Structure formats: C-alpha cells, structure tokens
Amino acid sequence: MTSDQETRVLAMLSAFEAGKKISELDTASGSVSDMRIEVLDTDGESKVMNLSEAVTTAANAVCGRYWNESNSTYRAAGYHGSLDMLRKLPELLGLGCYLVQDDRTRRKLDPTNHYRFEDGTPAKLDGTMGQYMWCWNIGFYFAEWKVGNLKYYAVSLSPIKGKQCVYIPAGGLSALGGGVMDRTNNILCSVVSDAAQYRGGNNDASRDGTYRTQLGMVATNMQYRNFSTYARKRGEGWDANWYVAQAVVEILFMIIFGTRNMQEAVIAEKDSNGLYQGGLGAGTTNMPNWDQWGYYPVVPTSAGIELGDGCGETTFNVLKEDGSLHYAAKVPVFFGLKHPFGHIWKIVRGLIDNVGDEKSEVYVAPSLYAGYDDNSISGLIKVCEVPRTSGYIKQKSYYLLCAMPTEIGATASTYFCDYFWENSASSKGLRVRLSGAGANDGTDAGAFATGTNNAASNSNANVSAPLCFFDADPVMSA
C-alpha cells in the first residue's frame, strides 16, 4: 500500500470512528423545507431529496408514466412516483364490472365470472338486477405536465402537489362498448339480452333469425344527441359516454400498460417490475365486406364476458349466411371493459368542436349535472384547438380531460398510433367527437382515435354511445 493510500484509509477510519448513531445526533433546529435526505433512486444510485417533498410524496402516493417526446416510440420511457401504487392501481381504483342501480348504488361482480356476484350469489346481466357497468369505484386526481422533452401522466387519491389537477369522481361506463336501447321504455341501458325489447342496430325486426340479426347487439343509427336524452332518463348522474368517462379509459390504459398503442399485441406476462405490458390486440377492426351487414354491429354484447375483469382478447366468429366463417373478430377487454376501441364508433358527449373558417376550437361542458346544449358553445370552456388536416395523432391534450388531438404527423406505429379524421375544408359548424373507430378501420383504430366530421344531429349504422354515470358531478373549471 502506498503512503497516499495509507493516508486515505486512515482518514476513512477516522471518519468512521467519529460517526454517531442516530440516537446520538443533535436535534435539528432548521426549517423542514430546507432539510435534505439521501434516497435510493430507481436507477440504484443514491440521490438527494428535499425532506418536506419526500414526506408529502409518501403520504400522498402518486403514480404514472412518462414519455420521452424527443423520440416517436409509443412505449413509455419509465414510470413516475410509487412503483408499488402503479402495480396495485387497478385494485386500488376497484377497476372491474359491477351491477349498478339507477340510484348509482352497485354490487361488485366476481372478477372471474360475471354471472355471479363477488360473494358467490347468482347475478343476471339482463337488466333485472341493474346495469352491467365497468367502473372505477373511487374518485381520483389526474395531472399531466412536461419537463423538457418528458411528458408525464399521473394519478393520485389526493391532489398532486405543484401540479394542475382535475378530480374524477367515482363512476362507470357500459361494459359492452356501446349503448343498448330498451325499445319499450325508450331508455339507454347496459344489458346482455337477446329479447326483442333490447334489439340493437336500428331495431330492424326483419333481420331476426338471420345471419345479420341485431338481437343482442348495441343500438346504433339514432341521432347522436338522443343517446344522452335516453340515458338521462335514469336520473341525476347518468349520461352517454360523457367526455370525462372517455378520458378515464385513455388515461388509465396509458398509465397501467405504459403504451399509447392499444392495438399492440397482447402479452400475458407482466414485466420485470411487475407492471402490465403490451396491448389488447387488433380488436374488431379488420371486418371484410362490412357493407353486406349494412355497417351495423356484428359482435353481440355477450362476447368477451368470459374474460371477467381480465385484460386481453377473445374471439367471436362472424358467420356468413350459409353458416361458414366470415371473420374471426377479436374482442379486446380492459379489466372487463369490452371494445374500448373498434367494432362500433362511440359518440363522446359534453364536448364540441367549433369548426370555423380559420380555426377548429374545442370546448367542454363545465358540469354534467347542469345539462348541456350541443347547439351552442355558450357557457362552455375552450380547452384546445385541433388540426385542420386529417392524419395519425402525434400529440393529444388532456387539459380538463378533453382528450383531443392537437398535432398530427405520426404513423400507425409511432406516438399515439391512432388516426384523426376531420373535414374542415368542406364543412363548418359545431361537431362532436367520435372515438375508437369501427370494425373496418384497421390500424387507424384505437381508443385515442378521433373523428370530428359530424354534428350531433347525425345518425349512423356504425355509431353508438355507451351508458355512463358518476357518483358526483365531474365539474371542470379553467
């Protein structure tokens, strides 16, 4: 050992001998806000952290994901906040399916078998025991922010310190990927039934008993705004795919799965951190010759129930008139939510795209409970502007949960991976958002997919709106 090495060893020994146990240290007298502690960071290195911030973070757990926007990948660059909370987020929020009464009280279904309740007693999905809903069972806060080239999305059960948060009350969305109509009582439902009372599509009885039957399907070809009218007949807190509910699906998928590509292949195994990875597969998006079915629903509401509260995909075989296979439709499932994208477009209510001569400005309603007039932007809050050209989505805004594209220029395998349709060059006026895309939209489809071509007075064979509810008014303020 050299003399220099001996000197350094003796210095280390002296420092060690001069060290004190915690019980021997003097009591601190400074401000907590000025104190710092050593922490072990996620990269395994020791780092310094403000003590006050550390205590606040530990007491008010936050979890999320971030993307490095200096590159185009749809996969998250890493996670933010508590890894343990992120692992347990689906359980923490109570994600899964419930039967919900009109007063919004609900019972949890067995996570592996939706034909019974969590306590093992039989459950019926035909409406006699409540509406079959996919729920987040507690409210939570959401924030998005950017640091340099890193874009963060995070959730917490408490306001996230230093961030502009929005509160999302507990609520739910039809588990079926569209709305079912009670044709007898003219009320929007979420039930699984082959009865004529709940016939889907445009209620065409002449299709009963044929390969194009609409029994057991979601309702379509109704004026967009009427879905809300029929949903609100259930009472306060009900509507049809209110924009906040649509945003919940998008946000939670990004955070839990760490990808913006919902059509990424299913990976059953979790990653090395115990987190979900991959996607939900192609979905019902590659239907050939859909025109032969008139662009009406082809997958019944019963498809996908067998996965319970799981994530992944199952298959429903669409048959030709002669009984032979026409299309093996993939049904994506997100913790029990069927068709978060694909099959049938979903109307998004409470949001308006005001397409003018020079700008396309997006507005949201500040309150669900206060009612909503889709013929006017009076009293609404401007949240963003959308592009004036169609293309794959590069950027989206989640300001006040609008979940709208703000920039195009991506591809089916970069950034948000989904397509944005608009027609401002040929049509002006107030437009609604359609989300998810349809059964023949291929890689253009996904929960982030957005169409703004149509007004609330439109009706289409391939468009529906799922029932939704909130325990409290999802109030937004600028």
Set out the residue ranges of the language-model regions:
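A short, polar/charged loop-to-alpha-helix boundary motif
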Residues: N354-L368
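Intrinsically disordered, low-structural-confidence terminal and linker regions
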Residues: A58-Y79
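Short, surface-exposed terminal/edge motifs of secreted or surface/virion proteins that either
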Residues: R36-T57
